[in-house]
Structures are given as structure tokens and as C-alpha cells.
Amino acid sequence: MQNILKKILLTLLLTQVIAAAHAARVELRWYGHSAFKITTPSGKVLLIDPWITNPANKHGQEDLSGIGKADLILISHGHFDHIGDSVAIAKKTGARLVATFDLGKALTHYGGYPLEQSGMDTLGNFGGELTLLEGEVKIAFIPAVHSSTVTKPQDTQDIRDGGNPGGFLITIKNGPAIYHAGDTDLFSDMSLINKFHKVNIMLVPIGGHFTMGPERAAEAVRLVNPEIVIPMHFGTFPILNGTPESLEKALKVIRSRTRVIPLSVGESIEL
């Protein structure tokens, strides 16, 4: 009897090991600037600040045309380089808008985002958390130190209030917790983020001029203490002259153990 039980337990263990080995993983793709695509283990697609056709992406139009599926579009604030191609993608895919309440209202009333693809289930505010995609994804709203205005696509002089800027902490079931910081400077409350959830991956702006540069970004990484940091919002324009190398150097100075993984535009990694 004991031998039979041992065989049953061994079979169950092997089944679990095999299942884990073949389990789908999370894929993260960088399109340049602050634009990312997350594909969950079940195949759901999240786009963050999807300016796919940004100047750093030589294949922007091709990449934009190739997006045939998107379930959620997350927009951190109202500036043109973060709204990006979201309206065109939303109309093509039916993706629902995830944003702060004020930004969501501005985007649907003035920015052209389809009204029926935005609602109370996907709009929130700082301190709040959404559970979406049948529980596979949780999205917490994180403050940022920046600004946020919205302009109509056909009239960039008509400036509208976009609420407060922010970032997102995206927690994926059976996957990592990813913190997209949006456009921001360093702020001390970043140290509170990992008190509520361990951050595995931090997507951090390093370009300077409109956001923090590498040295201040390194201090932000120290406060959040992720396992991995991926630099963003640099090199799109000449004035965004922070570099991943400078970030790595600054992290070494403060003896951070966080691993820097610089991505090339269009590159994907599995997590």
C-alpha cells in the first residue's frame, strides 16, 4: 500500500514539474520611449503608453500595423508622447482604457478615445487597484511627479486638463509585478511601493530634461528595490540624453544589487 501511495505522489509531483516547465511565461516588449507591450501567460495583451511610431522606432508603422490584439491600453498621463497611437489601436482592437478617472474622461471627451471602451471598471485613482481580465491582472495607480494635459488630435492649441500624472504597478497572476513609473522625478514615497507588494521589474525614465536623469533614477531604484530595472524614456530626442550606461554606473556607486537590463527598441524578453 505504501509503495502505491509513493508512486501516486511521485506521479503527481512529476506532473506538476512538467506542467511548470511548459507553463506560458510573461513577455515584455519595448517599442522605444515609454511604450511597452505585456503578454500574459493566458495570451492577454496590455499596452502601456503606446507611442509605437515614436522617432526611436524605425519599424514603428510596421509594428503599429502588426498589432492585431490588445485587451487593455494603460496611459500614464495626457502628453502626446504617451497617448501616442492609443486611439488608433483602440478603434482597431476594442481595447479598454486604463487611466486615472480625470484622464480617462479627458481622453474620451477630447482625445478621441472610444467612449464605450472606457468605464468605471477600468478607471481609477491613486491608492486604488483594479482587478481585470478575469482576475489575471491587478493594476494599482501610483503617483508621479510630472504634469498632464490633453490636446485634441486636430488642434494642439486646445489644451485640456488631464488630471494628475501617474504610473502603474501591474501584478500578473503566476507572473511578475511590473512597475511602470510613467514620466516622473524622484520622490521619497517611492519607498512605500514595495511595502505593499514586492516589485520584480521597474521600468524607469532616465532621459532627463522632462524626467529624472540617470543619477536620480538610480536613487529611485534604490527606494523601490526591484530585482530588475529596465530604462526607458531616453534617446527619443537629442535632449533626452541620459543613457543606460550612466544608470548602471550610478547604481554601482550606491551599491545597488538591482540588475539593469537595457532593451533595444523592438526587443522582447520573457519573464
Q: Model-predicted segments: where are they?
A:
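Binuclear metal-ion centers of metallo-dependent hydrolases, dominated by the metallo-beta-lactamase
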Residues: L97, T108-L132, A218, R222-L271
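Zn-dependent metallo-beta-lactamase
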Residues: Q2-V45, I52-N54, A140-I142, V265
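Pre-active-site segment of Zn-dependent metallo-hydrolases
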Residues: P41-K91, K105, L115-Q117, S147-G162, ...
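Active-site environment of divalent metal-dependent phosphoester hydrolases
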Residues: N54-P55, F80-G84, G104-L107, G128-T131, ...
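Active-site-proximal loop/helix segments of hydrolase catalytic cores
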Residues: V150-L223
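Local beta-strand N-terminus motif with an aromatic residue
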Residues: A70, G94-A95, V199, P226
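Active-site neighborhood of phospho(di)ester-bond hydrolases with catalytic His/Asp-centered motifs
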Residues: I48-D49, A70-G78, V98-F101, I178-G182, ...
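Beta-strand-turn-beta hairpins that frame and shape the catalytic cleft
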Residues: A23-V26, T40-L46, E129-A140, T171-I178, ...
